[in-house]
Amino acid sequence: MRETLEALNSLGFSVGQPEMAPQSEPRDGFSNPQEKMSSRDESTLHSCSGPETPGQKEGIHTEQAEAPCMGSQACIPQKAEPASSVPGEEWMIRKVKVEDEDQEAEEEVEWPQHLSFLPSPFPTPDLGQLAVAYKLEPGTPGTLGGIALSGWAPIPEKPYGCEECERRFRDQLTLRLHQRLHRGEGPCACPDCGRSFTQRAHMLLHQRSHRGERPFPCSECDKRFSKKAHLTRHLRTHTGERPYPCAECGKRFSQKIHLGSHQKTHTGERPFPCTECEKRFRKKTHLIRHQRIHTGERPYQCTQCTRSFTHKQHLVRHQRVHDAASRTRSSPDIPATPHPPTASLAPSPTGPKPFACSHCGQSFGWKKNLATHQSLHLTEGRPFGCDECALGTNVDPAAEPSACTPHAPDCGPGSGPVAPQRTTSSERSFFCPDCGRGFAHGQHLARHRRVHTGERPFACAQCGRRFGSRPNLVAHSRAHSGARPFACAQCGRRFSRKSHLGRHQAVHTGSRPHACAVCARCFSSKTNLVRHQAIHTGSRPFSCPQCAKSFSRKTHLVRHQRIHGEAALPASASNLSAPAWSNPSEVVPPPIFF
């Protein structure tokens, strides 16, 4: 109180000295705390200066008090000074300390209740505005602290910040509870998984995940949630509410965390680096997902087969294959595809292909592959149509009869209708400047150009052999591990590459989709077609280093070298000139367009 009065005196208010209540004053005198002490009534005060007894001090009391003087000498009458001359004198109240005579119990009189009915604890206009602006509380010791009000600053909304993660809090208790997370000192541990929490309420909310308790249902759909905040966030998907706008581009988001991640695209911030390589990521989840490439972890496994995946969305997409298969088995009335031989050209090694083309009946395991395939049926940019397969082409059949050769009649026994060869589509807007080949995506063109530049950025960790694409490296690594994940459904034979399986299945189906443009002979694989075309072109790229004799096939060269006393191809054979079509999967356009 003394500090409060001194601060008010420094502001120019005339405030009297604080008066001490007598220690022996009974409690009954303060039975009504709402009595107002009027400073206009003068009363005679007596000063007791007698010898002090233990626990007694010199005090001042009024004549109206029922208790006698504590001193043995005569009391000296004195005039009582006004308690306050401030216009709002009703607000000023003395904080009285009451003691029992035996000094066994002590208590302090709290602020009188009538103060809550006053319009403002600071009646003067200037002080009242300062009290509102600086959030000063009346009666709190050290509220002003003897410092001029001009030296006080407004209290920030969250003044306490964490040094570890830069989060801010309104009070120190919440800050200390939060800092336990960084130190791993959670006092409340989950008995099921051992996870620690700073507060018991958070631990109880977490235990709902173990019990499967979801007490908050969505009124729009059948989903349920364990927290009300999660339900509120989910409801925005139905209402379309996006309350968090980006200040840079105006894009709006339904969650604040999504806005924070989006803003990093403007700042270029990537705070999460990979410890194995030099890549950096905007989200920690992206870093964790990327690190599975280095560790080989595949945490998402299909419950119906043995396949596993690195991403959850890949597992969900894969499970649609099983769902479509179960629907097909449960619905026998589903009509068959119009062209069974075409649809069975490349069956999936892991299950059915639920996405069928409505034009030709060819089936696909993924919907995006079906969309890419259906672009072949577009007539825009293909003015010349084929009478057999209804596919368009850019070449006039009258000028070039072999423009649509897959339907040649002399394709061998059992060939039947074959899959049409894919020609350049109007949607292939990326063309190679070296060979003119077109691609639908820029990344496919960049991958193709490595054939011309000779770039091979992917190296095998076992033997050091390098490859131009990651799929080729993955397929090569199966040669070291012995993995053969692609099995034939007819004979059970297994293969390390899907293309090898498709080529093998042509043996069972009798399909020969690759026809020679010169003699109309058909082949089951494009490799055999390219090898056959060397007969018409006269190409003999494999030459013997000892007699200069050349051959069209490498196996013929190896067999010839046995004449010279060599049982196998010598080590120097690696320096032989390789044929232009030695790797047909890279040089010759593949029959399937991605």
From Swiss-Prot:
Gene Ontology biological process terms in this record: regulation of DNA-templated transcription; regulation of transcription by RNA polymerase II
Entries under SMART domains matching the protein: ZnF_C2H2 (SM00355)
Chief subcellular location: nucleus
Region (Disordered) residue spans: 1-70, 313-350
Signal peptide start and end residues: none
InterPro entries assigned to the protein according to its UniProt record, in alphabetical order: Znf_C2H2_sf (IPR036236), Znf_C2H2_type (IPR013087)
Keywords: DNA-binding, Isopeptide bond, Metal-binding, Nucleus, Repeat, Transcription, Transcription regulation, Ubl conjugation, Zinc, Zinc-finger
Name this polypeptide is given: Zinc finger protein 467
Lineage of the organism: Eukaryota, Metazoa, Chordata, Craniata, Vertebrata
